Amino acid sequence: MPAENTDDSAILDSLENLADRNRLLERLNGELRAQWNFGSIASVGWRPVDDGIHYLAVPALMVFSSAQKHRRIVHGERMMGERTFKDIAELLEAKIEHFSFDLPEDRPAPVSPADINSVFNRYAITQTRNRAVFLHDIAGFSLFSPEEQAAQLSTLEYSLNIAEEKIADFGTEVDLARSTTGDGYYAWNRIKGEDADVNVFCVLMVALAHQALQHRKITQRQIPTIRTVFGRGSHYSYHQNNRVSADGSDYIVGEITINLARLIDFAKPNQILISSLSQK
């Protein structure tokens, strides 16, 4: 077979596999979304089986009330080994659900565990024992007009985006997540670990430098004056899905957000306060 035809065949096979992957993940999302039931049900864990996956879904409130009974209910990856999966199913008295890939027996699955996790995590609740988070708060936010408030939030978001891009240009791993507080943002690195925490601090420093430069160029009331607090601690994570789609926002709540919310009251405009950074 000519090399050109071989290349064309490989491209077609690759496109077909990509289409199969997207269709399968869309079906999985649809099933987990139906289980989710507007947020009353949380997906807890899954494990691979020959023709698909087994997974657990229980009332979200049960996840919180049972979190101390087995660490893997909220800690670690949602893909579980057979023994752990069985133990948690028995502990939560959960029915084991089955999702079939609906593929011929000789056809390998076009999805990876990471693909499945990317969908599964939209409907899961997890806890992180220690992660760096910073809180950007716009000083005197309530004193500005709605137009000025919108401009300031937009400028703050722009600085965070620029900072993340600049840090990434140096080959540093940063996947910045944020959730709004109304007059600012909590921000953290989705990547976990001490290096990731250092990287998110670097993002913060670049963002603050960018904001300082903006103050020299743009009308004062359009550029926010920032109070910032930074620290490390534990938190729960969840994804807030929209009613009609899986699009939504990441949220964190727990020890670290409570501590930062208290600490911000002591921060002055243009000041950074740093909470305890000890590793627990």
What are these regions (language model features)?
Residues 1-6, 10-11, 26-30, 51, ...:
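Regulatory cytosolic signal-relay segments
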Residues 3-73, 192-280:
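Catalytic beta-strand-to-alpha-helix segment of the class III nucleotidyl cyclase homology domain
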Residues 89, 97-106, 152-157, 195-202, ...:
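A generic short-segment signal for beta-strand/edge and adjacent turn/coil regions
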Residues 90-98, 145-150, 189-191, 233:
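A broad, low-specificity signal for short, low-complexity segments enriched in glycine/proline
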Residues 95, 120, 125, 174, ...:
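Generic detector of bulky aromatic hydrophobic side chains
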Residues 101-118, 148-164, 208-216:
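Short charge-dense sequence patches
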Residues 109-124, 132, 136, 161, ...:
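Alpha-helical context
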Residues 120-203:
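Catalytic NTP-binding/metal-coordinating core of nucleotidyl cyclase/transferase enzymes
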